[in-house]
């Protein structure tokens, strides 16, 4: 299977029988629906009520029940890659766990997926080395950079230079190469996909947190599901010409999209400039929880919100050229890049 876009090539190498997905089963077309629920104080109970109301309305509106299937597992793709201060809220994660357990998922079959062990520990998703406190006892946390959750049959191929980390500026060669200090040219071309989300789970939910991004324009739903969800992807952050294409092509993988049920983001805190590094001086908080099956239109909405905040503080806006990955993703059928096409479903009657 191969997609070509801006000289970037997607290769999904499948060993015979390695996929649990039907090859002829296409993901549903994007709807443009965004569900919204107002929050009051960002407490656990606040999130729990909002998530349950959103789930009930989604199930009623679409006819799709968020219940266990044949695999009896569900994955939550968390975001921790801006470091302490800007990560998927714990209250939201606890609320989702409660809602999914209510629908029949067993405690141990709800797992979390994150990328970098240091940032997962600094943001509290992994136990503190000092206290050993586990934030989500009984729920596995899969750390992708451990190298344990990739399958050599599933990779994205691109002839870009080797990797670097846009947040810490440390080379991640050893971790991504299975402990080796050097890598071959062939290995450097490959970004291995995180298989637990689309091979082990009935479906998975994407939980992005929003920042701007100097190369991609917007760091949100699409990026959390792609470049923060595979090995050896930091290399793409070097090039504005190739990174948008890589995000769009990875997001268009049918097997990944088939189980990609929802994107849910809290506007408890988002950052409008200086990202993906966390900087509290450039953050905004709004009392809204947003949910959509369409990651592209959610990102398009947030580009507008980031630009509103930039305008108020005297910064230049994110342009269409800056965020062209949204157009690329729309061309590949991942979603709609035009925020004018949003169909709002205000579960509690509020308007963001």
Q: What are these regions, as identified by a protein language model?
A:
Residues 7-19:
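Bacterial N-terminal signal peptides
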Residues 22-352:
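N-terminal and secondary-structure boundary signal
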Residues 1-7:
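Positively charged n-region of N-terminal signal peptides that target proteins for export
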